[in-house]
Amino acid sequence: MTSFEDFHRLRAKHALHYARAILGSESAEDVCQEAWIKAWRAWGSADPAKLDSWMLAIVRNCCYERLRSNKATVTLEESDLSPVTSHEAVVVAALELAAAWVLLQRLSPPLREALWLREVMDLTYAEIADVQDVPVGTVMSRLHAARRKAARLLHKQVDR
């Protein structure tokens, strides 16, 4: 079995990006710390074959605990932008990122999560089902609905 330290080193950024996808704020770092502490405490009971989905499920649960406690805020951080060379490219990248973020925020949390896990984190349907604690068929339905709604929202933006 992988050591906890090795696993943390390999997956810390993935966990943080996932938390940011759910919370959309700097509180994602705090939530990730809570999640890693919970993971460390439960490390002995983790299934080595499912460590990634196990950790993402812990992150997800911590995020929803934070949302329930009404401590989450939505911000767009400068550090979320990719490095670019010109001022014009910075503006274009910021506008694209902001537009994508606004579109994602208009999806319900289960749809947004499923889409993020599939398209950004490249998880399989089975892994997403483990993380979201739902059947694979539900994951497929959520992804279909998320893509359909995202396309509809995008078409509305283009038509404006």
Give short role names for the model-derived ranges.
Residues M1-D6, L16-E34, A42-A49, V158:
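Short, charged helix-capping/linker segments at alpha-helix termini
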Residues A57-E78, A93, K156:
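Arg/Lys-rich amphipathic alpha helix in sigma70-family domain 2
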